[in-house]
Design a protein with these regions (language model features):
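Bacterial Sec-dependent N-terminal signal peptides
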Residues: 1-26
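A short acidic/glycine-rich loop-to-helix N-cap element
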Residues: 352-363
């Protein structure tokens, strides 16, 4: 009799789990529809979406294939993506938070304190904060790859750059500024940027699939980005897409990091948990609040992070005004809403086969709106 009861109980448990899974799939059907339609419309060949709410992952799903060829590998939740500019927040801004916490620099310190050669062509008074909020006056980027330059040539040209506008006058998103922040982090820590991030962020957070320069054994698990027909003349897979980062040996403050949705969620969960990790303070709550809040009414920029714009935000309509996030050129994004205790990680390889495809610009807000609607449906039950 006891055995029968146990068998019956086990069957009930299995049934409950199945119902729960079906219910959850139904609840997030709106999200599935957005992504499946985007793949059908060839906005990108594949994607991973992860939704975290109130302390746990409530949705994580892979869609599509590595390419539009259905015989190519299917995307898995463990698929590794070239993060492009999401590197700026997952690596460089997080590293800057840690340096700030440890009093290795002040945001108001001038760049020339650490890089004297930077102080030419009117850049003597630019601060670390100016670089992180993108109002330094530096150019957005340069086509270094069109010339025969080595690592030192690129760095020296960044340091000697002329300003395109007066520092503090306006906000212009600049790769050059964040590359410079990465070099400052190397100066104050005595470690390369990739080594510091590995030691102080990725290993402690158990982000085991997050790294610069994936080795040969890992590349097959990376979603391909672009078929490069103008510089490297090959399909890029497990090799950084960003040309400037490639010229800097794949390690730079603005781009170069590879990761998974699950790994990114570990970092974001720590930030949403007020900086706590395993009952220890990984980053001070006050530091997180400082870096993720909009700095000025004249811009959406926070310190390293971006915030939601009044209209046309990639976070959609329903994320709160306190939301912070970042996008990446390859088709990646993170958006977090502290008011809702929610974040969404959205990884795609929209560049495949060409960067001319910008359909993701419409998909991003649709996805985030669908997430909010699905969560509201859960709350209504």
């Amino acid at each position: 009799m006891k055995i029968r009861i146990k068998i019956f109980a086990a069957r009930i448990l299995i049934l409950a789990l199945r119902v729960g899974a079906q219910s959850n799939a139904y609840i997030f059907n709106d999200v599935d529809e957005v992504i499946n339609k985007a793949i059908e419309d060839k906005s990108f060949p594949g994607a991973v979406v992860l939704v975290w709410k109130d302390g746990k992952t409530v949705y994580e799903k892979a869609f599509g294939n590595f390419t539009y060829d259905r015989s190519s590998p299917k995307v898995k939740t463990t698929t590794i993506y070239d993060l492009a500019s999401v590197t700026k927040v997952v690596a460089t801004t997080t590293a800057a938070m840690i340096c700030y916490d440890r009093n290795l620099f002040s945001l108001d310190y001038k760049v020339v304190k650490y890089i004297p050669e930077f102080g030419v062509n009117g850049k003597e008074n630019i601060t670390i904060k100016n670089l992180l909020i993108h109002n330094s006056g530096l150019p957005a980027w340069k086509k270094f790859y069109e010339r025969d330059l080595n690592y030192d040539d690129v760095i020296n040209e960044i340091y000697s750059s002329e300003l395109e506008y007066k520092t503090g006058e306006k906000t212009v998103y600049s790769d050059l500024g964040i590359i410079t922040v990465g070099k400052i982090i190397e100066k104050v820590t005595g470690r390369s940027l990739d080594k510091f991030c590995e030691d102080e962020i990725f290993i402690p957070l158990k982000m085991n699939s997050t790294f610069y320069n994936p080795n040969d054994s890992v590349k097959q698990f990376c979603a391909p980005t672009e078929i490069d027909n103008y510089w490297r003349m090959k399909t890029l897979q497990g090799e950084v897409h960003d040309e400037t980062s490639a010229m800097l040996n794949g390690v730079a403050g603005h781009a170069g990091l590879f990761s998974t949705a699950s790994d990114i969620s570990k970092l974001m969960a720590m930030l949403m948990n007020k900086g706590e990790l395993d009952q220890k303070q990984f980053i001070k709550q006050s530091t997180i609040e400082l870096f993720t809040k909009k700095v000025s009414t004249n811009s959406t920029r926070a310190i390293g992070w971006d915030t939601k714009s009044d209209s046309g935000s990639s976070s959609g309509t329903y994320f709160s005004k306190d939301s912070f996030g970042h996008t990446g050129y390859t088709g990646t994004s993170i958006w977090a809403d502290p008011v809702r205790n929610l974040f969404v990680v959205f990884l795609t390889n929209r560049l495949y086969p060409t960067r001319e495809n910008i359909k993701i610009q419409k998909v991003r807000p649709q996805l985030h709106d669908a997430v909010i609607k699905c969560l509201e449906r859960i709350n209504a039950k």
